Regions:
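Inter-helical turn/loop segments and adjacent helix faces that build the functional surface
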Residues: 13-24, 44-55, 102-114, 132-152, ...
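Generic structural signal for well-ordered, non-transmembrane alpha-helical segments
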Residues: 30-38, 120-125, 151-162
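All-alpha helical catalytic cores of prenyl diphosphate-utilizing isoprenoid enzymes
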Residues: 57-140, 158
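Single conserved hydrophobic/aromatic residue that forms the stacking wall/gate
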Residues: 1-11
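Internal amphipathic alpha-helical segments of the cytochrome P450 catalytic fold
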Residues: 22-23, 37, 127, 143-147, ...
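Long, hydrophobic, well-ordered secondary-structure blocks that form the structural core
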Residues: 12-96
Length: 174
């Protein structure tokens, strides 16, 4: 669920990216998330005799949905705020320097910062905690194929962490 939302994030925030390098990076990130989603599907299909039960439960389990919401809520807030700005009048020449227009842009930036910080936490902490069990199976010589897949996903998530940290550090510099 979070993987699918991350792919959507990469696609939805592209209009708000002003650097071609970062836009290309997001494109690659989105592709990686698609591969991760298919990899998780492969692992589940090889562990459960009836994987449809697992897939169906994911979208109805409140604990899973609540956990995903903690990650995606700030991103949705940013997208909604940015969309409101785009469809309003604040960006037009006459309103650009108006106090309300400046406050609106500041709020969009605050929500974007919060969204990227949440993705940073997801990539840097939450994914690694969820990988621990798979790594343990691999060390015990059990489910080694799945552990290898998860280790490749962890490598990608480490790249995503570096990207979000770089973005945050560049914003901090001004």
């Amino acid at each position: 669920l979070v993987i699918r939302r991350q792919r959507q994030m990469c696609i939805r925030d592209r209009p708000y990216c002003s650097l071609p390098e970062l836009e290309a990076c997001m494109e690659v990130w989105s592709f990686m998330e698609m591969i991760h989603s298919r990899s998780y599907t492969y692992v589940i299909k090889n562990v459960y005799p009836d994987p449809s039960e697992v897939f169906d439960k994911i979208l109805s389990d409140n604990r899973i949905l609540d956990r995903a919401a903690t990650v995606t809520e700030s991103y949705d807030e940013f997208i909604n705020e940015a969309h409101q700005y785009d469809t309003g009048n604040w960006w037009k020449d006459g309103w650009r320097d108006h106090v309300s227009g400046k406050l609106e842009r500041k709020e969009i930036k605050r929500k974007l910062y919060r969204a990227v910080a949440n993705v940073n936490i997801l990539e840097g902490i939450r994914f690694y905690v969820s990988f621990a069990c798979s790594f343990a199976f691999g060390e015990l010589k059990m489910m080694e194929g799945s552990a290898k897949i998860i280790s490749l996903i962890a490598r990608d998530e480490n790249q995503h962490l570096a990207i979000t940290q770089n973005i945050i550090n560049n914003w901090r510099k001004g």
